[in-house]
Amino acid sequence: MHNEMVLDAANAATIRLVNASWSNYLQRACRNLHSIGQLCRGDGAEILLRRLKRTRPSTYGHSIRVAKFSRATGRAFGFDDARLKQLGQAAVFHDIGKILVPEVVLNRPRKPTPTEMFVLHKHPTFGAMLASFFDLPAELRIRTQYHHERWDGKGYPEGLAGKDIPLMARIVQVADTYDAMVATDRPYRKAHTHAEAIAELLREAGTQFDPHVIEAFIDTFPEEEKAN
């Protein structure tokens, strides 16, 4: 018990230290990326995606898959082509903030520590900061920032609830969670089957997820997949 209390205190102290120094770190990192970007050809969006693909290839692949699932769900909601394009962009950029998360934190072969989880939970805010530094549309910044909010208000970074969370962010959240469950094994968790992942989404409908988004998401799969 004493050792656990010491570890908890150490983690809390580390989190305070990280929080105190993180703003300066992020400002420097964003400025450096922006300076590099000004030397590259292409607009801010292209620069950020190239950086994500080069430095975080698994996150990039995940983002492309999330965009596919999100657009399919948007079609189920009756989105027109313009809104589908916006939704696809929001999905592709949803994890762009992980560019600023140290690679050692992203690739730990075990469950993250409380301090590492604290840093990971900052990535939506990092994404919004990057979008701002690179002059991406304000709507994209908002959708990037809120994809980890929860329907019941217990998410992050701002604890938004229900329809206060932008619909596109709610859609991306479901697609993001599904792909994270089925895509790959992790050292501390085996990949889910499609049926297992759908069952988990249904369990969390109305708490973590918008139940209408869950319904639309499931409807995008062929009937034979829904039964498996």
Predicted regions and their residues:
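N-terminal acidic, proline/glycine-rich, low-complexity intrinsically disordered segments
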Residues: 1-9
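Histidine- and acidic-residue-rich, metal-dependent catalytic cores
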Residues: 8, 16-228
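His/Asp/Glu-rich acidic catalytic environments and adjacent acidic regulatory segments
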Residues: 12
